[in-house]
Curated annotation (Swiss-Prot):
SUPFAM superfamilies: Nucleic acid-binding proteins, S-adenosyl-L-methionine-dependent methyltransferases. PROSITE patterns: SAM_MT_RNA_M5U, TRMA_1. Keywords: 4Fe-4S, Iron, Iron-sulfur, Metal-binding, Methyltransferase, S-adenosyl-L-methionine, Transferase. The active site is at C370 (nucleophile). Gene3D superfamilies: 2.40.50.1070, Nucleic acid-binding proteins, Vaccinia Virus protein VP39. GO terms for biological process: rRNA base methylation. [4Fe-4S] cluster binds at C66, C72, C75, C149. It comes from the Bacteria. This is Uncharacterized RNA methyltransferase BMEI1496. One of its GO terms (molecular function) is 4 iron, 4 sulfur cluster binding. InterPro entries: MeTrfase_TrmA_AS, NA-bd_OB-fold, SAM-dependent_MTases_sf, U5_MeTrfase_fam.
Length: 415
């Protein structure tokens, strides 16, 4: 098959992005929504192809959970049965580690349930027929207007029509914008972006609608428009008033799994540094037993963590520091007071911090990541510095996607 033709091919594997991969004489091509062993007709465009017809289906194929699957670009793998899907997702972590020469124990994938994603970032646009609200088509800016989503919590999906009403008031003409909805203990927290400058009339109308529909808050580009209720989320026993758009783990159940792994490894550590701590997802749980130094570059997240600490008694001391750990990692000397370090960086990982940590005498480390490639790089640095990787646990926090969370626990100086 040439680089811009239609033809028949056989899918050999699933790539790291969740697409089927076929090996052709002139290279690999990637075909979304296919499975290993399937024979398909495709329309090829260079190294990508569109599925035109399924000629021979895999016995591992199943009916997708959502009517929007293959139109909506939010999910890649609803059509794959659970067992092979989970083995493949675990292998993303195993393969990344082996690519760095790291052969360690990788636990079975921890499964997560459907209907548990507590934040949805919707693409939206106002049309003559109303507001489109949903997710972009696969590799496109076209918005697929949704009526269901088996990934997201029902409390958000039940409010789609109400969200469209809010979107109608926010819309910047006919241009696209984003509207995120986060489930908190106080109700739905709405955060809009890309709506341009809101005028006074819009603000008054939005305020009235948010109150009428019993949303907890509406913000735009980080500015709070109206906040009838403080959006709260508990981390351990500490209720934290989360700032607009702050980072949260995608599902509460995955967060609990990660926290349990962190706490089990830290054990009786007296002083812990929690790096890239966010709003205190792990720091506030750790503080129930250990003194914690929480480091984060997001001032609003740190302020929220601090407010949470001030309203709860019985915690060990919690100190906070605003710091860009990419530019200014904690140096080896600064790590001397700590028995343990936890770090949960963005997808780029924590290479500079890992280089300093590798030279330290910190006894226990927990590395958390949503990117197996950068996690493997950082773990290889720590391993070279004398750390022993005890175990890596992959967690399917991003159901039916090509993304996977992982928690690695490491020790130094103890056999």
């Amino acid at each position: 098959m040439t680089s811009s033709k239609t033809g028949q091919i056989t899918i050999r594997s699933i790539g790291a992005g969740g697409d089927g991969v076929a090996n052709l004489p002139d290279g690999q091509i990637y075909v979304p929504f296919t499975l290993p062993g399937e024979v398909v007709n495709v329309a090829r465009d260079k190294n990508r192809a569109t599925l035109m017809a399924l000629l021979e289906a895999s016995p591992e194929r199943q009916n997708p959970a959502c009517r929007h699957f293959e139109d909506c670009g939010g999910c890649a793998l609803q059509h794959w049965q659970d067992e092979p899907y989970r083995l493949w997702k675990r292998e993303l972590v195993v393969g990344a580690l082996k690519g760095r020469g790291t052969d360690v124990e990788v636990a079975p994938l921890v499964a997560c349930n459907p209907h548990t994603r507590r934040r949805a970032v919707f693409a939206a646009r106002k049309t003559e027929k109303g507001v489109l609200l949903g997710f972009n088509r696969h590799q496109s800016h076209e918005i697929i207007d949704i009526v269901e989503c088996p990934v997201t919590v029902p409390e958000i999906i039940a409010r789609l029509d109400d969200l469209r009403e809010v979107g109608a008031l926010l819309a910047p003409g006919s241009g696209p914008f984003k509207l995120a909805a986060t489930l908190t203990e106080s109700g739905l927290d709405l955060a809009a972006s890309g709506c341009g400058k809101l005028n006074d009339e819009q603000r008054r109308a939005l305020t009235a609608l948010v109150i009428k529909k019993d949303f907890a808050r509406l913000s735009h580009e980080g500015e709070i428009i109206v906040e009838p209720k403080k959006p709260l989320i508990h981390f351990g026993k500490v209720p934290v008033p989360i700032p607009p758009g702050c980072f949260l783990q995608a599902t509460a159940e995955a967060e609990e799994t990660m926290a349990a792994l962190v706490l089990a490894h830290l054990g009786k550590a007296r002083r812990v540094a929690d790096l890239f701590c966010g709003v205190g997802t792990f720091a506030l749980r750790i503080a129930e037993k250990s003194a914690v130094h929480a480091v984060e570059n997001d001032a609003a997240a740190l302020a929220a963590l601090d407010r949470g600490v001030r309203h709860v008694q019985g915690l060990k001391p919690v100190s906070i520091e605003r710091r860009d750990l990419f530019r200014r990692p904690l140096m080896t000397k600064e790590l001397l007071p700590y028995n343990a370090v936890v770090f949960d960086p963005p997808r780029a990982g924590a290479e500079e911090q890992a280089l300093e940590l590798a030279k330290s005498k910190v006894e226990k480390v927990v590395a958390i990541s949503c990117n197996p490639v950068t996690l493997a790089r950082d773990l290889a640095i720590l391993q070279k510095g004398g750390y022993r990787i005890e175990r890596v646990t992959p967690i399917d926090q991003f159901l039916w996607s090509a993304h996977v969370e992982a928690v690695a626990v490491l020790t130094k100086g103890r056999q």
